[in-house]
Amino acid sequence: MYPQLLLFFRSRDGESAEILKGVLHHQRTHRPWSISLHGDEQVGTDSSWLQGREWHGVIACNASPLFIEASSKLLLPIIDLSDSSTEYGVSKIRPDNIAIGHLGAEYFIDRKFRNFGFCGYSNLSRSNERREGFVEALELAGKHCTAFEVEHPDAVTPVWESKQIGLLAGWLRSLPEGTAIMACDDFCAQRVICAARTAGLTVPEKIAVLGANNDVIQCELGEPSISSVAINAYEMGRRAGEIMDRMLAGEGQFPVDVRIEPQGVVTRKSTDILAMRDKNVAAALNYIQEYACQGITVDQVLERAFMSRSQLEHKFRRFVGRSPQKEIRHAQVAKIS
């Protein structure tokens, strides 16, 4: 008889789909399970529902703390995939939020930004961890950050949304032109872009915005599309399947807090600009970024930079730290990888 596994996923967004793919890939290549997939709110909040069937294990994403606690008290093997701090001693698999913040800061630094901001929610642990990583990486590079943080309500209302857009717009107006802002997630990034529009600030020319999680639908819905740090949701699911198999086999100790490294940054329109004091160098760099893999030459770059070859060489070494030819190669390698 196959083990009976309950998979509870309240949301069916892109992240959840990737996690499920990872779980199912492990299951199909290892010990088979009998799986029940549920997303009903009652299943995730009503702990008595767990007693209705003889489950052998639970993998849950965004279930209530009551549900997680009840599963633990029933001595069910359980893996919690919610992106919050560890509770009840159960095995938790989640993104490495500190690393996500680090990656966001490094991305902006590489693109030559000099002013930085973070937007998030003070009562969400993942937001706080991402801010901590972002600020830490900036400080290691000798740079500083200003933050805009509010408490996120249990239920978002139109009144709350409108108020936040207004407050955000005021904060954005107070920032230096060309500030690079990391938002704690893609939904927050969308709010920042709406607030920038309210403030009369164009994205990415006046304000660059980077999200996190890389929810493709959310990132592609608006204009401009949102650049985002991509978490490795598939690997989260694969590791969940691996650890669940060990639990079902009766192995002893299991990791309590597994953190999965992000995959990288997916660049879209909201950050697709290089912050350079020299506008001609910025134009040349943007041209290289866009056409590096199409066999462009330094002569073609010169046509966009409106300067002599010697001036271009001098300014690239000053602002970029590489010659134009090496920058073309660097951009080619970055796109391939």
Describe the function of each predicted region.
Residues M1-G57, L66-F306, E313, A334:
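Bacterial carbohydrate/catabolite-sensing allosteric modules
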Residues D299, R318-S337:
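Terminal helix-turn-helix DNA-binding modules in bacterial transcription factors
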